[in-house]
């Protein structure tokens, strides 16, 4: 996750999509002084959205005088024009770290009507809905596999080409994804950076922590389509489903007898 130096602009202006995407109404007011812009490239005044008829920030009375209450701001948000208080700082070079941190927040207000899954960002919910509609999927020309994110499409392409640009400086082992290299380094160091806030247990991978957190809740998101039984973890559901498939994956090395449970 790249961290960029933040440079504060003299004038105040903020794109609406950031606030609309990440915060609900009650959180926007408290967040004004802390926000960083969403991923829109390198921002300058010429890139910001202004009122009709305004050619620059200096000509826009809204930017000079700030906004007249929170409600006015929220109304403008819907039209993709957001006027902020003149004391709100705008970043020219901003970090993606705030956006990344929001993914790990417990506040997941945006719920999918199809599968009841909750997400922390509106853009994530919009993208998630495509899973159900199969809309605008990105297809790999080599293997035909489809993805709902264009960034995920680059991963199988590197597998097909054999390209491994990410190299471990310690052992020299190379990987086709930077995330796999990161996991590899953590295994080498024994570091467990992902800690459970409930019990303090630490994990090497964020996915392991996410799976662990379900233990502390009553949530059982994994349901068997055969009998309707629900489980907290997908591996438990997978083991349960073997009962219906007749599969016996666990084999005794001594006599060769196979079993459906370990």
Curated annotation (Swiss-Prot):
Show the GO MF annotations. Answer: DNA-binding transcription factor activity, RNA polymerase II-specific; RNA polymerase II cis-regulatory region sequence-specific DNA binding; zinc ion binding
What Pfam families does the record tag this protein with? zf-C2H2 (PF00096), zf-C2H2_6 (PF13912)
Does this UniProt record's set of keywords contain DNA-binding? yes
Q: Taking the first listed entry, what is the main subcellular location of this protein, grouped into a coarse class? A: nucleus
Q: Per the record, GO CC terms?
A: nucleus
Transmembrane portions of the chain: none
Q: Where found in the cell?
A: Nucleus
Q: Provide a GO biological process annotation.
A: regulation of DNA-templated transcription
Q: List UniProt keywords, sorted A-Z.
A: DNA-binding, Metal-binding, Nucleus, Repeat, Repressor, Transcription, Transcription regulation, Zinc, Zinc-finger
Instruction: Identify the SUPFAM superfamilies for this entry.
Output: beta-beta-alpha zinc fingers
Zinc finger (C2H2-type) locations?
110-132, 138-160, 166-188, 194-216, 222-244, 250-262
Q: Does the keyword Repeat apply?
A: yes
Q: Which InterPro entries match?
A: Znf_C2H2_sf, Znf_C2H2_type
The coiled-coil regions, if any, are none
Q: What does this protein do?
A: May be involved in transcriptional regulation as a repressor.
Q: Which family does it belong to?
A: Belongs to the krueppel C2H2-type zinc-finger protein family.
Put simply, this protein is called Zinc finger protein 138
Originating organism:
Homo sapiens
């Amino acid at each position: 996750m790249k961290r960029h130096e933040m440079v504060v602009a003299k004038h105040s202006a903020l794109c609406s999509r950031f606030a609309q995407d990440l915060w609900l109404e009650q959180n926007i007011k408290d967040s004004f002084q802390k926000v960083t812009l969403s991923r829109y490239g390198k921002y300058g005044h010429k890139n910001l959205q202004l009122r009709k008829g305004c050619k620059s920030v200096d000509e826009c009375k809204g930017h000079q005088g700030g906004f007249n209450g929170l409600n006015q701001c929220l109304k403008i948000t819907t039209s993709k024009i957001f006027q902020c208080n003149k004391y709100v700082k705008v970043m020219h070079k901003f970090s993606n770290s705030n956006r990344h941190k929001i993914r790990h927040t417990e506040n997941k207000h945006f719920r999918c009507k199809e599968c009841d899954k909750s997400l922390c960002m509106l853009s994530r919910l919009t993208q998630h809905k495509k899973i159900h509609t199969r809309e605008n999927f990105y297809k790999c020309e080599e293997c035909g596999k489809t993805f709902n994110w264009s960034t995920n499409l680059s991963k199988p392409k590197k597998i097909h080409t054999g390209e491994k640009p990410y190299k471990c400086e310690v052992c020299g082992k190379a990987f086709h994804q930077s995330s796999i290299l990161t996991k590899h380094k953590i295994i080498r160091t024994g570091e467990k950076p992902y800690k459970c806030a409930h019990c303090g247990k630490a994990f090497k991978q964020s996915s392991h922590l996410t799976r662990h957190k379900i233990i502390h809740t009553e949530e059982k998101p994994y349901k068997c389509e055969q009998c309707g039984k629900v489980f907290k973890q997908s591996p438990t559901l997978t083991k349960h489903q073997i009962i219906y498939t007749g599969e016996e994956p666990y084999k005794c090395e001594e006599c060769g007898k196979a079993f459906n449970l370990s």
